[in-house]
Amino acid sequence: MTQQITLIKDKILSDNYFTLHNITYDLTRKDGEVIRHKREVYDRGNGATILLYNAKKKSVVLIRQFRVATWVNGNESGQLIETCAGLLDNDEPEVCIRKEAIEETGYEVGEVRKLFELYMSPGGVTELIHFFIAEYSDNQRANAGGGVEDEDIEVLELPFSQALEMIKTGEIRDGKTVLLLNYLQMSHLMD
């Protein structure tokens, strides 16, 4: 069912790094009643993420980096273990994720497989993330990784079983990473 939505006002509150909108809109309900809503929406662009796995070694490549939003929300160190990811900017998702993989992990991946696209926080964030997996091997290591410019990224090659256990212990708390690790487990690619 399509609901009627009428934009009343879109005020930009900030466009420092990303864009924060204050949006006023009317939503016509199924019964015909029109309800006015006022919401803040954070537009950070769309992104892509990839989980690198090695079925023979039963390992995955993740990264650890400082994430200020987690630090503000009580993650004492601000460090987060996650899959390689980045904003699309003007790139296609596959182009973006290949670039991010080599910058962040040092691996120049071959065939990548797109799994799905998901909104991770649709109540207030516009971002749509494209999810990928790719098998990696040691001979695809082009550099040490670690990111670019102001990034300080640690590359982690972990046994797959340990990564799954780290979800249970709370060491891995990033949503996209949990989704991709669980997908890998359910797909039986590591069996």
UniProtKB/Swiss-Prot annotation:
Xref: Pfam families: NUDIX
Keyword Magnesium: yes
Residues the entry annotates as binding Mg(2+) 1: 85, 104
Domain of life (superkingdom): Bacteria
Chain positions of motif Nudix box: 86-106
Molecular-function GO terms, alphabetical: hydrolase activity, acting on acid anhydrides, in phosphorus-containing anhydrides; metal ion binding
Enzyme class: hydrolase
GO cellular component terms, semicolon-separated: cytosol
Keyword entries, A-Z: Hydrolase, Magnesium, Metal-binding
GO annotation terms (biological process): nucleoside phosphate metabolic process; ribose phosphate metabolic process
Required cofactor(s): Mg(2+)
InterPro entries for this protein: NDP_pyrophosphatase, NUDIX_hydrolase-like_dom_sf, NUDIX_hydrolase_dom
Record-linked SUPFAM superfamilies: Nudix
Residues at which GDP-alpha-D-mannose binds: 17, 38-40, 67, 85-87, 104, 127, 150-151, 176
EC numbers on record: 3.6.1.-
Reaction equations catalysed: GDP-alpha-D-mannose + H2O = alpha-D-mannose 1-phosphate + GMP + 2 H(+)
Residues covered by the Nudix hydrolase domain: 43-180
Described function: Nucleoside diphosphate sugar hydrolase that hydrolyzes GDP-mannose as its preferred substrate, yielding GMP and mannose-1-phosphate.
Family per record: Belongs to the Nudix hydrolase family. NudK subfamily.
Domain topic, free-text comment: In the dimer, the N-terminal domains are swapped between the two monomers, such that residues of both chains contribute to the active site.
Record's subunit section: Homodimer.
Record protein name field: GDP-mannose pyrophosphatase
Organism: Shigella flexneri
Name of the gene: nudK
